[in-house]
UniProtKB/Swiss-Prot annotation:
Family: Belongs to the RnfG family.
Signal peptide: none
Lineage: Bacteria, Pseudomonadati, Pseudomonadota, Gammaproteobacteria, Enterobacterales
Coiled-coil ranges per UniProt: none
Name of the molecule in the record: Ion-translocating oxidoreductase complex subunit G
UniProt entry keywords in alphabetical sequence: Cell inner membrane, Cell membrane, Electron transport, Flavoprotein, FMN, Membrane, Phosphoprotein, Translocase, Transmembrane, Transmembrane helix, Transport
Annotated compartments: Cell inner membrane
HAMAP family (alphabetical): RsxG_RnfG (MF_00479)
Membrane topology: Single-pass membrane protein
Amino acid sequence: MLKTIRKHGITLALFAAGSTGLTAVINQMTKSTIHEQALQQQHALFDQVLPPDRYNNNLQESCYLVDAPALGKGTHRVFIARKDDKPVAAIIEATAPDGYSGAIQLIVGADFNGTVLGTRVTEHHETPGLGDKIERRLSDWITHFSGKTISGENDTHWAVKKDGGDFDQFTGATITPRAVVNAVKRAGLYAESLPAQLPHLTACGE
């Protein structure tokens, strides 16, 4: 009787150990898969704001942290694009703090000469049917930044038409596009300062 109990106890212990090990392996595999999918989604998003033929380095391995008021409160990431090891452009995370329903998060692709190469909204809480037209899936409005050059902080073209600029506002929603235009402009201007900062920037993960 005692031998039988011990035998069953050992069997259960081995089963439990095996189950725990299998669960750990599955969890690790799941984490790896989720991480890989996140990287692929990020890469696809990068392609929308920075033409792949402009650089030949791994952007995701060229990530730096910056604390710049021009990009909004807190720390933001910048990804430096290089062509044959020469810095040529950047993808910059930026925050428009003055959206109608709160902060709007964006990424902006820009070269170092004041030209915006593309931008996309990554997070917002704007009103459905009005301010949410900043999303690419709902409107092509966000694509109108591509190829636009900023001549300086006082460039009047970088405003919505209601304020005398070149960018359309939305019917019934001016605050949202105004916030995005201003945030993209600030990010584009900030990009011009990046080459000089590169030796001093903190790499992501450090």
